[in-house]
Each structure stands twice: as structure tokens, then as C-alpha cells.
Amino acid sequence: MALQLYNTLTRQKDIFEPIDPANVRLYACGPTVYDFLHIGNGRMLIVFDLLFRVLRDLYGADHVRYVRNITDVDDKINARAAERGIDIRVLTDEMTAIFHEDAKALNCLPPTVEPRATEHMAEMIAIIEKLVANGHAYIAEGHVLFDVPSMPDYGKLSKRPLDDMIAGARVEVAPYKRSPTDFVLWKPAKPEEPGWESPWGRGRPGWHLECSAMSWKHLGEVFDIHGGGIDLVFPHHENEVAQTCSAFGHDVMANVWMHNGHLQVEGQKMSKSLGNFLTIRDVLKDWPGETVRFTMLKTHYRQPIDWTLSSLRESQRELDRWYPVARAFDQINPDNIPGIPSSFRDALQDDLNTPEAITILRRLYKDALETTDYAGVHLLLCGKLLGLFDQSLEKWKNWKPASFTVENVTFEDLIKEREEARAAKNWPKSDHLRDVLASYGIVLKDNKDGTTSWEAKR
């Protein structure tokens, strides 16, 4: 079947027709590097890594260009660097390196290009100059702002009427704005802040402008697919569309817009106040990256996902069963094997239908146990297309939580901590500690007298 993708712009699944099949172009909004990324950011990384893999499988690895940016100029970055008393570049380099480690642990392929916002000031200034020249931007009190009413179809991505946006604007609107909906393209920089010389004085760009400049530089004025989290549809992606289309005179910036759904934790919105805020690094301390990835893929990318310990536990169990079967076929000559089953490719080409693809993996595993021809090697090949089975069987079996050692006293301390959590009826912590120990091969048994015994199973 032909690749079909749900397009936020059209609100339907469209058959994907690249502008140039020999140069398929994909852009995804990357991180603002001021802190550790949370697990919801991890979902976005995995979703668009999967899309990158599917496009490479369909068009050839040399014919797909994936750009995922680094935002390294932002108010949050300035504030965090000041808080820590370090140079901004030191902070952004440190957090970018940590981000790369997290992405690698989740088995995400490196993008073709990973541009930094600070390296694209010339492109940003050029776009602003175009917008001012053609009447879509104006200068006011050292700022340059996009004139939203000058674009008749503003709101076409988010499907928000302009009148509703004006009514919903904050009561306190900067006095230099012509319309409450106008947004900043360039703003003055304080002496202690990073800044760049421009025709409008020393300053720095607005957030939305950065992605317009980087996508233009590396993918062109119009490209195939733009992606990100659902929270970016408005205002970030809407404003990208406004800037780029108004600057270059096209009706679209990207032909397809894709957005992954929200993530919640144990049925609740993730927040620091609830104590359930999880960074990618937090999760990777207790679970293998492939387990995290597999858990994400079990839910269709457009649906909300409920991040639970039980779902992680089940993913770990499935991969523990599948790994020995899949990796048993490492040495087989691929030239002697029929290609990936068409049903598996069809599932992924149906708007990245990973739940259906995983159902097929389960069927292949069952068939492999019954010695069906090629089922085991198909399990391996299909899993690899999802970004699974990337390790040797020995490495998979020997994985241990990074924060623990193998000495019994460590286990006893954890078991005691869990008993205290149970006594305090802190069930989430109790379940978490049980899962950590289980991933390390320690199986607990809660006794009637309130104590807990354990045995090593792995």
C-alpha cells in the first residue's frame, strides 16, 4: 500500500507524495537545551525516529534528509545559566551532550542535520527583512513584530479563527503591538544577555523564527513533512507557517504536518507538584532504553499515552521472551531470506500504525516457536525496523539498573525501603521499587506477617 500519514493541516489521512522522491525532507522541532528532557519529549524523539526509519525503508537511506534542531537561545536558557552561575554556551553544550546520550539510549538514529539556532542568525535576519519589506512585519520600540492581520488565512493549521484568538489574548498587551495577536520576530537584548547585531539594533530572535530559518536553510522554502508534539500546533507551528509563507510567498511551508499526542503518568498529568515528573534520564536508570521505546510504540503516536509501571513491566517481559528467538538469526545471510512481510510494512505505512505492527510481531514470535519458516528472522527484521533488537543477546541479558550493584546488602536495603513505603501506603513507590528489583532478577514475596522475602530468578 502507499504511505498514508495523518495531516494536521487537512485533518485527515493523506497519501504521502514527496516533492522529490530522491530527496524526501523531514523537519522535527528539537529540544531547548536548558535542562534534562522529560519522558514526553522522549515520545516525540521516538515517533519521528520511527518515521525517519520508515521513510528510509521506503525511499532508501540516501534519499531521506531529516533535520532536528537544537534551540540554544531562549529565556529559559538565560535564566538557568544565571541560576547556576555558568556561561550560556557551557550550559547548552552540557545539556546537548546529555540529550544525545538519552536519544542514543532510546535507539534513535542521528538526524541527517542537527542545526543550532545560534548558527543561523543571518537566515533569521534575512527572513525578517523580507517580512518588513512586503508589509507583514513592523518595527516598534526596538522590536520587530509579525503583523498577524496582514495574513488573511492565519490560523489555517490550528483551525482557530482570528477573532477568537484576539478575544482570548491576555488583557495586558504590550502597548507597541498593533494587534494583540502579533508576535515577536526580534527583540532587544539586555546588556547581560546574549545578543546579535541587526538592522534593528543588538537583540535576539523570537522562538518561532528560529525553526523557520533552520528549515529554510537545510530543507528549502517548501518541504515534505514538519513534525512535533501536539502542544506545538499553536502558537509555535502556526507562527512558523505565518512567517515562512509570508516571507517566501507560498501557500504552505510543509505539505504534511504531524503531531504526537500527550503523555500522562499513572493516569495523571505529569507535573513536579504531583511528584510524578519523569525525565528520560530518570527512567533510563531503571529500564533499558529499548523497553522504554517499545512501551511508547505500543500506543499509536496520535493517541494520548498513559505511562505506567505495569506497561513498562509487560514490555520488559515481552522483550525478554522475544530477544533469544530474534537474535538466534544474527548470522543468517539476508540474501537467502524473503523480505519483511508485506502486512508489517502495510501497518507502518498506515499512519505509523505501531499497535498493529506489534500484533504482527507477536504472531511472528508464536510462529517462530512452532518453527514456521523464516518467522524468527522476520521477527528480527521487523523489530529492527521499529528500532528494537539492537543489542546482542548477552548484552540484553546482562543489563542492570545503572544505580545499583549486585551485592545482597543493596537488595536488602531496597527491600527494606519498599517495606517502609508499603507501611506508609505509598503504593506508587512500593510498586516502583518492586519493578526495579524485578528488572534486576530479584522476585519479591510479601508475607502475611508484613515482612518480605526474595529470591533471584534471573
From Swiss-Prot:
It is found in: Cytoplasm. A motif ('HIGH' region) lies at residues 31-41. Its cofactor is Zn(2+). It comes from the Bacteria. One of its GO terms (cellular component) is cytosol. Its EC number is 6.1.1.16. It is an enzyme of class 6 (ligase). It catalyses: tRNA(Cys) + L-cysteine + ATP = L-cysteinyl-tRNA(Cys) + AMP + diphosphate. SMART domains: DALR_2. This is Cysteine--tRNA ligase. The gene is cysS.
